[in-house]
């Protein structure tokens, strides 16, 4: 390994803010003229990102690459773990499915292979880039797992990277979690910690100052920054932990009520992110029939286990309520990927890809049937769709292990390079597609929202802001925010100094 200067961000626990701080540093380094790459050796997430060559990586690393202004590759996240069943996950290696494994088997059988994969990817990135922003996972102090971990201090050693430890003050007990983490680290690993960042701070910094002084005196580790909580950031969330903060209640101050079904194996829920930026929309994630209500737009998102999530909706009454909404109310229903499969007549699983159940009836709102297959499709796609009498060019990505066949009466939704994709009802109130990022297409999103507005007797809104522009602005806003509250120059100096010392 040679060229790149590395820095690694680890946290005291999951959702401490590692991904967002890493994203900020990708942007900061890139704007300072350094060719920068993100890296996460092993990511457990159901939010995916498809690279230009049709490979699947964690969504966070794809977004971090965008923040850095570089093209995402599988070397940036060579191992992706996608939970599919209880205690079982699909292991994705360099963007392609490797095999389904239970946690114990993965830990026992995959370790040496994983080490080789990670080392190879690190070698590629270290030789191609000037800066490498590495993200850990969970906590580096998981003493029951550390003998065979593949994502925290072992990666720091492989990359010879200094580590910044991040603590989340919003949860409380930040000093205890920081001190406890430091004390549980091996002596040599503790030497890699060049400082800590306290994240998600709310309140008066003067009240925190005595604690910062005590921490530095007690541990000898400098506090490199205290980052205030940043509202309405509009950068893709790493995992479903973020959904805990989403409202389930209707907001009467917003014109359009959007409900997203939050089934247990929800995936790629970032598909709805553009609606979070629309001033007239309120997005709710709902898990029960009682929470569903009568939304204007109902979205069935992706699922890592479509059959189990469909059974979940049938058992708790959501499926029946969807049928009643479709029959008696003017709701628009959109299913994406697994949600699209659920809208059909039936789903077959002849190979037991998801469950021992070989067939299940769907919601029967679209004339399609789906067969789950062993081979996964991962591809960037583009095509033409017709909606409200207009034609729209749309881009998206597909990640699915099923093939949906049209039945009598099917109307395709998108025409993609000579093939028909998706389905819609004659009145365009029910739509299904494999296209993730469908709503990221600004013109179509505007047409969909204006159709709903007209049906509610509201004037249409034209000239909505481009979501890509909003996200680019969000990267800059995040970078500026972190630069104001973190000692960037001190961190860079420590990065250089670290490479000159023996650890």
UniProtKB/Swiss-Prot annotation:
Keywords (alphabetical) are: Cobalamin biosynthesis, Glutamine amidotransferase
Query: For the GATase cobBQ-type domain, which residue ranges apply?
Result: 255-444
Which pathway is this protein engaged in? Cofactor biosynthesis; adenosylcobalamin biosynthesis
Q: Which residues form the active site?
A: 337 (nucleophile), 436
One GO biological-process annotation of the entry reads:
cobalamin biosynthetic process
Q: What SUPFAM superfamilies does the record tag this protein with?
A: Class I glutamine amidotransferase-like (SSF52317), P-loop containing nucleoside triphosphate hydrolases (SSF52540)
User: Molecular function (GO) terms listed?
Assistant: ABC-type vitamin B12 transporter activity; catalytic activity
Q: Mind telling me which InterPro entries this protein's record contains?
A: Class_I_gatase-like, CobQ/CobB/MinD/ParA_Nub-bd_dom, CobQ_GATase1, CobQ_N, CobQ_synth, GATase_3, P-loop_NTPase
Sorted alphabetically, which HAMAP family does this protein's record hold? CobQ
Q: What does this protein do?
A: Catalyzes amidations at positions B, D, E, and G on adenosylcobyrinic A,C-diamide. NH(2) groups are provided by glutamine, and one molecule of ATP is hydrogenolyzed for each amidation.
Family to which the UniProt record says this protein belongs: Belongs to the CobB/CobQ family. CobQ subfamily.
From the Swiss-Prot or TrEMBL record, give the protein name. Answer: Cobyric acid synthase
**What organism does the record attribute this protein to?**
Geobacillus sp. (strain WCH70)
């Amino acid at each position: 390994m040679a060229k790149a200067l590395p820095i690694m961000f680890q946290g005291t626990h999951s959702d401490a803010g590692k991904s967002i701080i890493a994203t900020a540093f990708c942007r900061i380094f890139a704007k300072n003229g350094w060719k920068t790459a993100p890296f996460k050796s092993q990511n457990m997430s159901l939010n995916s990102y498809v690279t230009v060559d049709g490979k699947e990586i964690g969504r966070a690393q794809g977004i971090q690459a965008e923040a850095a202004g570089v093209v995402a590759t599988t070397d940036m996240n060579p191992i992706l773990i996608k939970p599919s069943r209880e205690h079982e996950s699909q292991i994705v290696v360099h963007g392609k499915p490797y095999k389904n494994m239970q946690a114990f088997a993965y830990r026992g059988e995959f370790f040496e292979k994983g080490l080789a994969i990670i080392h190879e990817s690190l070698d590629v990135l270290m030789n191609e880039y000037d800066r490498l922003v590495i993200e850990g996972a969970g906590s580096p102090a998981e003493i029951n797992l550390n003998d065979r971990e593949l994502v925290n201090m072992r990666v720091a050693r492989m990359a010879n990277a200094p580590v910044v430890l991040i603590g989340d003050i919003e949860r409380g007990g930040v000093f205890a979690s920081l001190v406890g983490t430091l004390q549980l680290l091996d002596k040599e690993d503790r030497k890699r910690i060049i400082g800590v960042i306290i994240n998600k701070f709310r309140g008066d910094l003067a009240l925190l100052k005595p604690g910062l002084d005590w921490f530095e005196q007690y541990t000898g580790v400098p506090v490199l920054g205290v980052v205030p909580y940043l509202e309405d950031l509009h950068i893709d969330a790493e995992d479903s932990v973020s959904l805990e903060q989403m409202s389930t209640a209707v907001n009467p101050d917003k014109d359009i009520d959007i409900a997203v079904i939050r089934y247990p194996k929800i995936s790629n829920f970032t598909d709805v992110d553009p609606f979070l930026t629309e001033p007239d929309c309120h997005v709710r994630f709902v898990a029960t029939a009682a929470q569903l209500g009568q939304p204007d737009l109902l979205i069935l998102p992706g699922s890592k286990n479509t059959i189990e999530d469909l059974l979940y909706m049938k058992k708790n009454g959501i499926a029946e309520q969807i049928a009643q909404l479709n029959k008696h109310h003017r709701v628009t229903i959109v299913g994406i990927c697994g949600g699209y499969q659920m809208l059909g007549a039936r789903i077959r699983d002849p190979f037991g890809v998801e469950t021992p159940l070989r067939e299940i009836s769907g919601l029967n709102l679209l004339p399609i049937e789906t067969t789950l297959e062993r081979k996964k499709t991962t591809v960037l796609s583009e095509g033409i769709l017709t909606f409200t009498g207009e034609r729209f060019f749309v881009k998206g990505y597909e990640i699915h292990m099923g093939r949906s066949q049209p039945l009598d009466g099917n109307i395709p939704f998108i025409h993609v390079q000579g093939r028909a994709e998706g389905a819609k009802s004659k009145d365009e109130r029910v739509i299904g597609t494999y296209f993730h990022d469908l709503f990221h297409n600004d013109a179509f999103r505007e047409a969909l929202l204006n159709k709903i507005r007209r049906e509610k007797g509201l004037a249409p809104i034209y000239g909505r802001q481009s979501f890509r522009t909003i996200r680019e602005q969000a990267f800059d806003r995040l970078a500026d925010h972190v630069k104001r509250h973190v000692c960037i120059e001190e961190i860079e100096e420590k990065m250089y100094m670290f490479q000159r010392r023996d650890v």
